[in-house]
Amino acid sequence: MAKEIIFSDEARNKLYEGVKKLNDAVKVTMGPRGRNVLIQKSFGAPSITKDGVSVAKEVELKDSLENMGASLVREVASKTADQAGDGTTTATVLAHAIFKEGLRNITAGANPIEVKRGMDKACEAIVAELKKLSREVKDKKEIAQVATISANSDEKIGNLIADAMEKVGKDGVITVEEAKSINDELNVVEGMQFDRGYLSPYFITNAEKMTVELSSPYILLFDKKIANLKDLLPVLEQIQKTGKPLLIIAEDIEGEALATLVVNKLRGVLNISAVKAPGFGDRRKAMLEDIAILTGGEVISEELGRTLESATIQDLGQASSVIIDKDNTTIVNGAGEKANIDARVNQIKAQIAETTSDYDREKLQERLAKLSGGVAVIKVGAATETEMKEKKDRVDDALSATKAAVEEGIVIGGGAALIKAKAKIKLDLQGDEAIGAAIVERALRAPLRQIAENAGFDAGVVVNSVENAKDENTGFDAAKGEYVNMLESGIIDPVKVERVALLNAVSVASMLLTTEATISEIKEDKPTMPDMSGMGGMGGMGGMM
């Protein structure tokens, strides 16, 4: 297929048009008074969302060059969501503002490479300043405030997440599910999560979520590789008679054995799934033992004189449910005895007290959290399926933002932290590098401007007032239309969200600004069907039979 090559300003301007269209769709969702976006689906009812990344993912433009620009910024939103869990709209708005301002300067003759260098230096300085401005999350109240802001000022969701984190600890596992009623619920269940996903996508039982969901499964634990399925046959036959699912956790399951399990799953002979054992070496053995104690099973280990062939159904662990995605496995309500679990917890605590290695201590604490923390399940209720999806998106965002806040600390919210950080940096740059730094510094006003605009206030006046405020914690509460102490009012953001959004925005904007040529496919118009209107008389050909 023929390709079209476009150069310099013409190429960048086309890319900018795509970025602008994406930004225009995403920016309306920003802030406490942001609006919803209605998205048509190829099947089913349209969805309503106020989640920036959900809007960005749906934007596909007709013009291939514009779509290239939009897709790069869409990637920024998606990457920010993956890394920080929130800040997707902030990243999009910043990327657009930096690209717009940079394009104007490059069109006027600035050197793109020098401009990029200045942008990178400014970004580095602002990130360092944000870290200085941050402070640790002190208590449950602040956790609730972070979650509330991220859940579009929904205090109920904020309090629910704070309760969940209080019950399972900051390192505990919190999952979000759909409730059967219209009420939100919080359930804490004993459970364990480890970072190993399914060995084959053919094990998936929930195609929409791309997860394996096993109800009341047996759990087989083996500390070596499974290469030959013949050794597994005795226990598989016993499992088949019970009609229950089976989860195999082993060092690995090699080609032929895995293929046979997949075939049996697809034919409906066995409801089975398999994951690799977590950890490596001695730590893997210890974690398998943790899982065995939690589920009331035994690790089949050749070191203990046991072979896979000798395994019986009595050696298997059990749980009320197991959920596996491509990255993680969560075991809920293991059937292990509480006394054994408590003894194991105390043993790990003793090891933590004795160890001199920071790395070992960190890994032991991870095991302790998995064994004793349990799993908190937030069940989201709503009157309709559309509302349910929108609300679940907000809870997921809020949960990720809260974890980010606990991880790296908090700064004042509402776009004010970026402006306060900008005021503190002093860069000694010359020429086009100074222009690059100034572009980033000016763009830092964009999130606050957008929040004020969406709330119906004069953006210029709001930004000016926040910039000139004497108290460094002063910002604009768009929900009330007042200038307040953001910390006292509970309007706070995780510093990780601000940092990741800025880094990703500068990264994509600098790539776009240093683009000198684009290559895209030329869309050929497909010939239209010939007019058949003159052939109406052919209907009488039925008489030829």
Swiss-Prot record:
<dbReference type="GO" id="GO:0051082">
    <property type="term" value="F:unfolded protein binding"/>
</dbReference>
<feature type="binding site">
    <location>
        <begin position="477"/>
        <end position="479"/>
    </location>
    <ligand>
        <name>ATP</name>
    </ligand>
</feature>
<comment type="function">
    <text>Together with its co-chaperonin GroES, plays an essential role in assisting protein folding. The GroEL-GroES system forms a nano-cage that allows encapsulation of the non-native substrate proteins and provides a physical environment optimized to promote and accelerate protein folding.</text>
</comment>
<keyword id="KW-0547">Nucleotide-binding</keyword>
<dbReference type="Pfam" id="PF00118">
    <property type="entry name" value="Cpn60_TCP1"/>
</dbReference>
<dbReference type="InterPro" id="IPR027409">
    <property type="entry name" value="GroEL-like_apical_dom_sf"/>
</dbReference>
<dbReference type="InterPro" id="IPR027413">
    <property type="entry name" value="GROEL-like_equatorial_sf"/>
</dbReference>
<keyword id="KW-0963">Cytoplasm</keyword>
<comment type="similarity">
    <text>Belongs to the chaperonin (HSP60) family.</text>
</comment>
<dbReference type="GO" id="GO:0005737">
    <property type="term" value="C:cytoplasm"/>
</dbReference>
<dbReference type="InterPro" id="IPR002423">
    <property type="entry name" value="Cpn60/GroEL/TCP-1"/>
</dbReference>
<keyword id="KW-0067">ATP-binding</keyword>
<feature type="binding site">
    <location>
        <position position="493"/>
    </location>
    <ligand>
        <name>ATP</name>
    </ligand>
</feature>
<keyword id="KW-0413">Isomerase</keyword>
<feature type="binding site">
    <location>
        <position position="414"/>
    </location>
    <ligand>
        <name>ATP</name>
    </ligand>
</feature>
<protein>
    <recommendedName>
        <fullName>Chaperonin GroEL</fullName>
        <ecNumber>5.6.1.7</ecNumber>
    </recommendedName>
</protein>
<feature type="binding site">
    <location>
        <begin position="86"/>
        <end position="90"/>
    </location>
    <ligand>
        <name>ATP</name>
    </ligand>
</feature>
<feature type="binding site">
    <location>
        <begin position="29"/>
        <end position="32"/>
    </location>
    <ligand>
        <name>ATP</name>
    </ligand>
</feature>
<keyword id="KW-0143">Chaperone</keyword>
<dbReference type="GO" id="GO:0016853">
    <property type="term" value="F:isomerase activity"/>
</dbReference>
<feature type="binding site">
    <location>
        <position position="50"/>
    </location>
    <ligand>
        <name>ATP</name>
    </ligand>
</feature>
<comment type="subunit">
    <text>Forms a cylinder of 14 subunits composed of two heptameric rings stacked back-to-back. Interacts with the co-chaperonin GroES.</text>
</comment>
<dbReference type="InterPro" id="IPR027410">
    <property type="entry name" value="TCP-1-like_intermed_sf"/>
</dbReference>
<dbReference type="GO" id="GO:0005524">
    <property type="term" value="F:ATP binding"/>
</dbReference>
<dbReference type="GO" id="GO:0140662">
    <property type="term" value="F:ATP-dependent protein folding chaperone"/>
</dbReference>
<dbReference type="InterPro" id="IPR018370">
    <property type="entry name" value="Chaperonin_Cpn60_CS"/>
</dbReference>
<dbReference type="GO" id="GO:0042026">
    <property type="term" value="P:protein refolding"/>
</dbReference>
<dbReference type="InterPro" id="IPR001844">
    <property type="entry name" value="Cpn60/GroEL"/>
</dbReference>
